[in-house]
Amino acid sequence: MSRLQQLQAFLAQDPNDSFTRYAIGLEYAKAQDYTAAIRTLEELRTIDADYVPTYLMLGGYYREVNDTANAEAIYKEGLLRARKSSDLHAASELQAALDELDDQ
């Protein structure tokens, strides 16, 4: 059983587990299936909008498919949520990603 299959089995047992859904998105991206990665992290964003790690990765995956408009919107939303939850490290990473996007 692959890591992705294991994670999917875990998610089937607990569909509300944000970390597992996030990890599935990362596995798809690892396989360069950015469409599936984006779909998975968008689902996570709908289910648990306050799961801050989602935003940096999701924005990056939008960049991988050359969708800079969505990447920018995701980074900005993540920045707001990170600040709201006082996650200064995530806010810093999201701001850096946004700045890098603006420099392109």
Q: Each predicted region: which residue ranges?
A:
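Conserved structural position within tetratricopeptide repeats
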Residues: 9-12, 43-46, 80
